[in-house]
Amino acid sequence: MRLFAQLSWYFRREWRRYLGAVALLVIIAMLQLVPPKVVGIVVDGVTEQHFTTGQILMWIATMVLIAVVVYLLRYVWRVLLFGASYQLAVELREDYYRQLSRQHPEFYLRHRTGDLMARATNDVDRVVFAAGEGVLTLVDSLVMGCAVLIMMSTQISWQLTLFSLLPMPVMAIMIKRNGDALHERFKLAQAAFSSLNDRTQESLTSIRMIKAFGLEDRQSALFAADAEDTGKKNMRVARIDARFDPTIYIAIGMANLLAIGGGSWMVVQGSLTLGQLTSFMMYLGLMIWPMLALAWMFNIVERGSAAYSRIRAMLAEAPVVNDGSEPVPEGRGELDVNIHQFTYPQTDHPALENVNFALKPGQMLGICGPTGSGKSTLLSLIQRHFDVSEGDIRFHDIPLTKLQLDSWRSRLAVVSQTPFLFSDTVANNIALGCPNATQQEIEHVARLASVHDDILRLPQGYDTEVGERGVMLSGGQKQRISIARALLVNAEILILDDALSAVDGRTEHQILHNLRQWGQGRTVIISAHRLSALTEASEIIVMQHGHIAQRGNHDVLAQQSGWYRDMYRYQQLEAALDDAPENREEAVDA
């Protein structure tokens, strides 16, 4: 029953719907008490031979009318009750998605995608079923059960009623024990389903890699193991579930046996008429539904309670980064980074130390360094995926922690290392941040990203569907479409996180030239492994082991002893060797 207490906030808000449904349920329960009474009257009237045919037909017509009214009222309360429960599903999913969208990368490191999807679908469905069918079953069984007991006790015989219901306390104890066991086992079954869902999602999104490495059999075996584990845990739930109905039917059978035995003795003794015993047995038949419903309700509610506890656990997780209260001031501003130290949550080793620089509007910053040196961490801090533990980052001389997240991020356009495209047209992917952009604006940024000609060569040009995650496109095309998408936003700060790694040197040079022209008055931050992408930067910082090892422009660093010069010379030599065969072929042709 704790689920109903946990959902009391919703029941209080939708009290009109639920109260209306409950009122109709009470009316229906009262109407259903009439037919057994009528049957008893008719039986006594027929056995005593004082009923006419007209009287019998009148009572039959009364029962038919009651059946029609009950049918109509059941339709109305179902609309009221289930309409309210479906609205709960909408709100739970909206709250859940809003919570997921507020979370930051650290959250998604701890939670698997398949598990998050299972909570949004399967768990919410269980809660909604409990809020609809569970409430209906609870109210219907209580109202009907109490009404029938009152009629049996007051209108027929309280002694026979008490005698026939002796098995009920044992049944209630068994249902409570089974309900508690069901709650725990269902939580385990839902967790297993989440793992299976996660395995499915991972396998489908990585199907190309699986085929490339010939891992189909291995993945099938892993999936089969997860499916078997899920099946076993659901079977454990089914074993508990299967105990409910036998418990109810044994109790009902015992109650009928006691009622027939005790009632027959009372008829022989003259304290009951045959019609009253017939009515009593019909009332006892009406008790079958409340007893079955009670067991079913425990089943539904315990499943819903286990599911809701999983949803609440997710909704209760506070974001690592808290929203600020101040909007970002209008106009272009200076970005000041002053990081004394930053350490990732649940780790001891600092990821960044003593990183300081200032960027004025119109400047371009290049960031380079070996793998794992802290480049992406620095960009994550600028985007406020995490907050600096010691030091701060300021914009317009205001710490980012004081700025509204939405307001700050609206000033950023980011292209990450792994560009993500939606299963939509090329044009819609470019216009993601500006849905009202014109075709001319879309084509303009595509030209700036040097992808316009590639798009025109696609089957339907800008209207070509790119497939899930852009599966129809090459890596370089996906990167350039992502760059075009960022440029269309026309943000004040553009961040490219190794976003040119999949394009050739000539295309890279053209894109950087276009960015330089486009970026007049804007701040551009480029992180790259290929140093040719940084030659036009106003300043370059070389990251090593989480701190700045070198800084300066390209000309200075190319002459200065250190990582930058060594890597630049190596890449120049590598490029020259790659061009050598082509040069030799041209010489032979000459």
From Swiss-Prot:
SMART domains reported in the protein's UniProt record: AAA
Protein name, per record: Multidrug resistance-like ATP-binding protein MdlA
Domain ABC transporter: 337-570
Origin organism lineage: Bacteria, Pseudomonadati, Pseudomonadota, Gammaproteobacteria, Enterobacterales
Protein topology in the membrane: Multi-pass membrane protein
Enzyme class: translocase
Catalytic activity: ATP + H2O + xenobioticSide 1 = ADP + phosphate + xenobioticSide 2
Sequence similarity: Belongs to the ABC transporter superfamily. Drug exporter-2 (TC 3.A.1.117) family.
GO biological processes: transmembrane transport; xenobiotic export from cell
Binding positions for ATP per the UniProt entry: 369-376
Gene responsible for this protein: mdlA
Keyword line: ATP-binding, Cell inner membrane, Cell membrane, Membrane, Nucleotide-binding, Translocase, Transmembrane, Transmembrane helix, Transport
Cellular component, GO, one term: membrane
Domain ABC transmembrane type-1: 18-303
